Amino acid sequence: MNNKNLINDVKVTQVKSSIGRKYDQKLTLIGLGLNKINKSVVLKNTDSVQGMLKKVEHLLKIENV
């Protein structure tokens, strides 16, 4: 397998508020290290992170780094 084609990091920015969202979505944002609008974090692109991003993708802007 060629590791050069794999994306290692993902930059995630919270663009919508967690107010009025389900409790598990709020916990997912906290788990990703996001707690304020326009806060960005760079995360390793793992299966668990991908699952968390999919759960709250409507609140985020996701970019490959």
From Swiss-Prot:
Keyword Ribosomal protein: yes
Example GO molecular function: structural constituent of ribosome
Domain of life: Bacteria
Keywords, ordered alphabetically: Ribonucleoprotein, Ribosomal protein
UniProt cross-references to InterPro entries, sorted A to Z: Ribo_uL30_ferredoxin-like_sf (IPR036919), Ribosomal_uL30_bac-type (IPR005996), Ribosomal_uL30_ferredoxin-like (IPR016082)
The protein's assembly and partners: Part of the 50S ribosomal subunit.
Listed name of the protein: Large ribosomal subunit protein uL30
